[in-house]
Amino acid sequence: MTSTLAAPRQAASWMTDDVAAVANLARDFFTRYVCPQAESAAREGRPDRELYRQAGEMGLMCMSIPEEYGGGGGTFAHEAAFLTEQTLAGDTSLHLGVHAVIVPHYILAYGTEAQKKRYLPKLASGEWISAIAMTEPGAGSDLQAMTSRAVPTDDGFSLSGTKCFISNGLNADVVIVAAKTDPNARGAGISLFIVDVTERSAGSDPVGFSRGAALRKIGQKGQDTAELFFEDFPVPADAVLGSLNGGFAQLKTQLATERVILGVAAVASMERAVELTVEYTKQRNVFNAPLFAMQNTRFELAECATIAHVSRVFIDQCISALVDGHLDVTTAAMAKYWLADQQCAVIDRCLQLFGGYGYSLEYPIAQMYADARIQKIYAGANEVMKELIARTL
């Protein structure tokens, strides 16, 4: 079961005719190609990588990347429409926010011309799948505590370390890896590298690089999440992304976009939850009357619908600011933490109205409940977001 709600419910300044066309195309893509494979993706712990190629053929990848690098030449508004439709369709298997938005914009912002020409067209086509590896077993929200090392060699660097909870980790061909190039410094000693693992021998990853098994998660089970291991993995000198030891500043800058991406999903998820619950409560009879006729049900849904509407106004403001180049780190942090909190709360309240059926994965609301919980954790835990906001007060 998927929602028929078009995204977004309220017309926004960023929802131009061409962006609306992207939303319609994305809705067709998820309905026809992705959702029918949801069960197989959940069993395998990863989606079929051919879906990335399919999205590329339909022009749905890297839409905010310039056309000269294989992208669509659009703005973040096009990406937001696409990601909204993904959430409304109920898909969490394709981590397209990472592959088609986050990683390409790191390369666009900090990459050399050679790096842009080598990687961006193949990411846009879906031929290569991308990931970004920041988190480590002992360094989650505190990225400055990472211990992965990139030691200089005669022709580049030798990379060693473990990265965990990496979205697209199993399917990735290209990984942006954060590692210490100055072990005596914290954030000032972090550099970013474009690590190319496309060269495989007999189906195996290159020497010095390996992947763990798909992580068993409580939600988003079809989404590819894995550990990555580097052991004296050779990285050429021209793989440095941006300035040496400038990686932490680059991460802080780009994380604002990532947090808005999570906000986009949070709002669409709330809208979907409300719609599914209204539909269910109007069909479900209790005490010889529709559940929707009960005052408690109506009040609960009225409050949830209001929260979803206010959240839509907030995320529309963030999307417009990002499109115009005016989004600030503090507002992005506010959006990430508050919208994630509201998403989890609204889905929980909606699930309650399903009664015991809400605890069954046969009903989408149960899967939404499990899928939503990570929103408070990744891209910076909500507690960290509050600290970032407090520093500006």
Language model regions located:
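Long, acidic (Asp/Glu-rich), low-complexity accessory segments flanking structured domains
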Residues: 231-249
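Short Gly/Pro-enriched turn/cap motifs at secondary-structure boundaries
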Residues: 96-98, 123, 138-141, 165-168, ...
